[in-house]
Regions:
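Structured segments of extracytoplasmic/periplasmic soluble domains
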Residues: 27-30, 61
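Membrane-proximal amphipathic alpha-helices
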Residues: 9-21, 30-39, 44-47
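N-terminal alpha-helical membrane-insertion module
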Residues: 1-10
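Extracytosolic and intramembrane catalytic regions of membrane-associated proteins
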Residues: 36-186
Length: 186
């Protein structure tokens, strides 16, 4: 019985990997201008808004995954960090980026006007905290040492991360899904 359960889980993990890989390859192939826009990273209102919209469309374009995220390297102070943006990154209720409001605080945040009030948006709001193996993977990707696609399956959570390079800039696109009980179709 244990061998049957283990074998079923293994087949589910491999099938999900194949589905996510095919979906990711199609999304990248069908959306070159959107991928290029994501690769043109700068920490400002326009980028966050554009990235959230692109990632929301990608996550709704294919039922094989529930969420799309872009991970980019950046710095806060002198510390190298990773920032992650998703469809949930939308800055709802924001009217506009306040004029001359760049470089606010230690992390070069910016000021926006939300419902008539000024509000600071900081990089720390978008920090991505990878586990050790993810951090090692991201370090290799952003150092230009690998183009490896990273797949992870754990407790019914599936994620596939794909490095993308454009005009000397590197981003990592991650697509993820959750399957209750780890079964396809359950």
């Amino acid at each position: 019985l244990a061998a049957l359960l283990f074998g079923g889980n293994y087949l589910t993990v491999q099938k999900k990997r194949q589905i996510l890989t095919q979906s990711l390859e199609r999304i990248v192939k069908d959306n070159p201008s959107q991928i290029n826009a994501l690769a043109d990273y700068r920490f400002d209102f326009a980028y966050i808004k554009k990235a959230a919209l692109i990632l929301e469309l990608m996550s709704k374009e294919d039922s094989a995954f529930k969420a799309a995220t872009v991970i980019v390297p950046d710095t806060i102070g002198n510390k190298q960090v990773y920032l992650a943006f998703s469809a949930d990154s939308q800055l709802s209720g924001i009217d506009e980026q306040a004029p001359n409001a760049r470089g606010v605080g230690d992390d070069n945040g910016f000021v926006v006007t939300r419902n008539g009030n000024k509000e600071t948006i900081s990089k720390t709001q978008y920090l991505y905290a990878p586990n050790l193996s993810e951090r090692e993977y991201l370090q290799r990707v952003f150092a230009g040492q690998t183009n490896e696609i990273r797949y992870e399956a754990k407790d019914g959570n599936y994620s596939l991360c794909h490095p993308y390079r454009q005009n000397g800039e590197t981003i990592v696109l991650c697509f993820s899904d959750y399957q209750q009980y780890g079964k396809i179709g359950s």
